[in-house]
Amino acid sequence: QRLEQVARQANVTISHETKPVVIEGVSRLIDELIYNLASNAIRYNRPGGTVTLQCGTNDEGHPFLAVADTGIGIAPEEQGKVFERFYRVDKSRSKARGGTGLGLAIVKHAALYHHATLDLSSELGVGTTITVTFPIQQDEPFA
């Protein structure tokens, strides 16, 4: 609900492509992971753009969550840095975009906690997709 309001204000459409999937883990952390991915996708989108939330299982049977946007994209030289705390791709627009620079760092740590992998695919002016792929079965229980 929070995301829908933010998306409306930014004139961004949210769509869902979901299939039933079970992701083992701490639901609060997974919720934060999804929220931070989606809010970044909205924040760095363009008016009239789209954010697509996906979940399902990949070809190997691993559960995944993906957030794709039609936003500004991330330059190749910036892509390795976006999961660092307080890192901002476009520092000149920091005040206009809002946020703390912690969203994707939270995503990274939530993914690591769940033994998940992160994949970022982006093209300037086209958009970005971030996919979080979870293990099929956890080796050890979550604390």
Predicted regions and their residues:
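Conserved micro-motifs of the catalytic ATP-binding
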Residues: 18, 22-25
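Short conserved segment of the HATPase_c
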Residues: 74-88
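Conserved glycine-rich
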Residues: 115-116
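Glycine-rich G1-box
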Residues: 5, 72-73
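Short helix-loop "hinge" at the ATP-lid/N-box region of the Bergerat-fold HATPase_c
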Residues: 41-42
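Short conserved segments within the C-terminal catalytic ATPase subdomain
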Residues: 4-16
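Short beta-strand/loop element within the Bergerat-fold HATPase_c
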Residues: 48-61
